[in-house]
């Protein structure tokens, strides 16, 4: 099944930045965010909404790796941590939402200095809507490859294929989704920019309200998407949502970057 406003078609183009990070060019479009009532093991915070993404954006082909993190930040936050395999191609973990945001800011500065990024562009975390739109890649099924969870092992690392390997694996080893994105299902949870709310936001370019306007009880929670190497298939579904304090760091938390034009003043007030 395909989403309204987009088709699976050919895999989108990609670009490579100055640190060797490949980004997939995601087209603008419309889609239904969340899961249908009949989806197996869906939960109430996935109630469907109609979303329009009015602008194209770039999204990391893989999760940010340890090697990429070290190039930009010069640190190893995962060093000495539990359940981590040190490898430049493994995802950077033990990073909070704040850490990931700082990485995006520093990468923006590096790219501008290298002449690879225009003054009106930036790197940032994807919004929750952008993340799910890119994960689905034109599909409406539980996963980007269909509804059969038995196929999940071909596309991601989850609790069913990491029992003897208790760590996140090298990025890009599993099959990509229809738009060429790897590890959207499993491996590590991925931070999104949004504050967490119990209901999804629809409309055009939705972003959960910023600090000071979010109603309790979630004033510090940010959205996590994608599942990780130690969860059941239900946690790796395209619509699955999770949340945690923005300062939390753990062995199963990572992120991928988005690249887009800077938000306008009107957009920042959303």
Kindly give the residue locations of the regions a language model identified.
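Bacterial N-terminal signal peptides
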Residues: 1-4
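Boundary at the C-terminal end of the N-terminal hydrophobic targeting segment
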Residues: 7-12
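Conserved beta-strand positions that form and line the central face of beta-propeller blades
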Residues: 14, 25, 50, 82, ...
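Mature N-terminal segment immediately following signal peptide/propeptide cleavage
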Residues: 16-33
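Short loop/turn microsegments at loop-to-beta-strand junctions
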Residues: 22, 121-122, 176-179
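Active-site microenvironments of metalloenzymes and redox enzymes
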Residues: 30-41, 51-154, 193-204, 259-270
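Surface-exposed recognition segments
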Residues: 41-52, 139-145, 162-167, 184-270
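A short, contiguous structural element within a folded domain that forms the immediate neighborhood
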Residues: 152-181, 214-215
């Amino acid at each position: 099944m395909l989403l309204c406003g987009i088709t699976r078609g050919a895999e989108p183009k990609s670009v490579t930045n100055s640190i060797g990070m490949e980004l997939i060019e995601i087209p603008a479009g419309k889609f239904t965010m969340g899961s249908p009532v009949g989806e197996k093991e869906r939960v109430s915070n996935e109630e469907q909404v109609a979303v329009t993404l009015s602008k194209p954006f770039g999204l990391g082909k893989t999760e940010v790796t340890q090697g990429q993190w070290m190039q930009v930040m010069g640190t190893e936050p995962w060093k000495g941590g539990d359940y981590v395999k040190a490898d430049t191609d493994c995802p950077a973990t033990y990073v909070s939402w704040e850490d990931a945001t700082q990485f995006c800011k520093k990468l923006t500065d590096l790219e501008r200095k290298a002449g690879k990024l225009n003054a009106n562009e930036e790197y940032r975390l994807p919004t929750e809507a952008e993340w799910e739109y890119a994960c689905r890649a034109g599909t409406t099924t539980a996963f980007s490859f269909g509804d059969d969870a038995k196929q999940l092992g071909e596309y991601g690392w989850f609790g069913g294929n990491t029992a003897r390997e208790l760590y996140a694996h090298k990025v890009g080893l599993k099959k990509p989704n229809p738009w060429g994105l790897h590890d959207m299902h499993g491996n590590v949870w991925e931070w999104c920019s949004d504050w967490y709310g119990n209901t999804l936001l629809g409309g055009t370019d939705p972003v959960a309200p910023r600090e000071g306007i979010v109603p309790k009880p979630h004033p510090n929670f940010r959205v996590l998407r994608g599942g990780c190497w130690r969860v059941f298939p239900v946690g790796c579904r395209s619509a699955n949502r999770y949340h945690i304090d923005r300062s939390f760091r753990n062995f199963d938390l990572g992120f991928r970057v988005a690249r887009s034009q800077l938000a306008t003043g009107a957009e920042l007030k959303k």
